[in-house]
């Protein structure tokens, strides 16, 4: 797959991780558990899945996944532990010069950040407010009491003729257990409250606030990937038996079908601008139908002759 796609011109590849739930109503499913998306939403039963993807240019390629088992199930592991296993097994493309790990606030644990640094990768992640500096002060106090006039207006253009504007503050700090990093406070409006301020952390050298925010916003590609996996290849929709191994294989089949779709129709992906797996699936179906019609016509002409 990676051999047929054109490499990134700058040699930079993003390793993006995110979790999702596929709702399941079965009460005897071995891997389904009760959960909710946030403190304000209701509970539901679903199959929790971690997905890791590579992103460069217009491409988004799923490379690994793990199912988060219920706490009462055997071989249970926390999502961060599963993510570290996938990080350990990850082999960068041969042309990749820089690997940047992008994730939300649920993944930057101490062991995870240390593993990223040990492997020589960089990270751009959102931090929880419970993290502390080397002087034992919390990020929450820092964000809450930072004066508003220190924020500066910044923007970038993810696509032509479309500008995204943010208010940001950047500083070099020393985090406990991690060391010196660059922290970026980002909010969409100047008068937003501290609760609406996003805390971003990176170990990229000489990174600007504009670059850090632009890299973190590319995490949206994994949301598009999850939507396409659920709608195009039926992620988690297969009805299988109670064996956990068969459930894992059913999820793997959805990712393999997505990879095959990109392999067959990668020429339909534009180098600039958005694209969708729905379009690739439609083009693939039309191509297969056209081949079948042409084959039938050739047989009829051969019989008539």
Please report, for each region that a protein language model flagged, where it lies by residue:
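Active-site-proximal, Lys/Arg-enriched surface segment
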Residues: 1-59
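Charge-patterned, long linear interaction tracts outside catalytic cores
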Residues: 177-206, 220, 224
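An internal, acidic/charged active-site-proximal segment
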Residues: 67-187, 273-280
